[in-house]
Structure formats: structure tokens, C-alpha cells
């Protein structure tokens, strides 16, 4: 919420990140807001926020830059884990099937493919046409499991699972909000690590 803030108080956290776009069946297009699901975007965001805070608070710049470097190093470690663990999967198993096209940035970075029921959140999410399209795609793509995000209706993917004959993995992916403190997605670090753990467990044969 940026109400009441002027431009000098706002930071473009995703500065330098190439946007990716979503389209609905009618051709409407919007920027995919889920860039943060990609750890490399998290690294860029950490750099941008650290630089902006250090500039805004020069008297605390040294401390800010130190903490920013620590946070960046943590994200670089997560990025390395994503590259190693996803890279160890056979190419044909690097197919992530989820309800919405939230993981567009992440799959592009780590050499995966995402299939989905819908791209843009609308009142028609999980329509018969969308479900049928994904089921047809899954005649050729046969991942070990399908996935459902923690914040979406599970019914459309259950229909896909039944028609395609592919089970849904029992742990959800996280695509939007953090979880409550102390949960598996209670911090951004936990959020990213939880998604990697879930993906690998669900895709590895």
C-alpha cells in the first residue's frame, strides 16, 4: 500500500527485471506479478532495496549494506540449490503443472516448463475449456504429479487429475502470500525453500 507516499519514499524493487506477460482467452494482457517466485529476482530485489535504503539513510549505510549482503548471500545459496536440484531432474520430468501461470519467471530461469489451467485470475478460472486444454496437453506431458497452490480452489485440478490420470502431490506450492510466522512459508527464505522441496519431491521419480 503506497497511499500517502511520494516518489522519494518508494523503491522499484524489481528495477532491471525483464517483465513477463499473461494473456487471457480474450487477448487481454497484463504483467505477471509473480516475479518474486524466482530466487534470481529475489537477489535483484535485495540489491535494489539495499542500495535505496543506504542512499536514503547515509548515517546507517554501512549497517544496511552489511545486512543486505548477508541477505543476498542467503538468496544466492537458494539459487544454487534450485540450479543443482532442478538440473538433476531428467529434462522430461521438469514439467511443473499448477493451477495458475504464476511460476513463469522461475521455470524460465531454471530450464523448466509450466503447464497450467489459467493464466489470469478471472471469474472463469477453471472453466471446462481451460480444464480440457490442459488435459489434452497432458496426453504428451506426463509428470509424476500435478500441483495445487495453497491459496486456490482445488476442484479444477482435481478434475484434471481424474481425467488425465495423474495424481496431485499432497503438499501445496506457494504462489502469493507468505504463511504465518513459524510455518513452512513464514519467511521469504522459507517460502522459496518450501517450493523447491515440494517441486523436487513431486517430480522426482
What are these regions (language model features)?
Residues 1-205:
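Extracytoplasmic metal-acquisition and chelation regions
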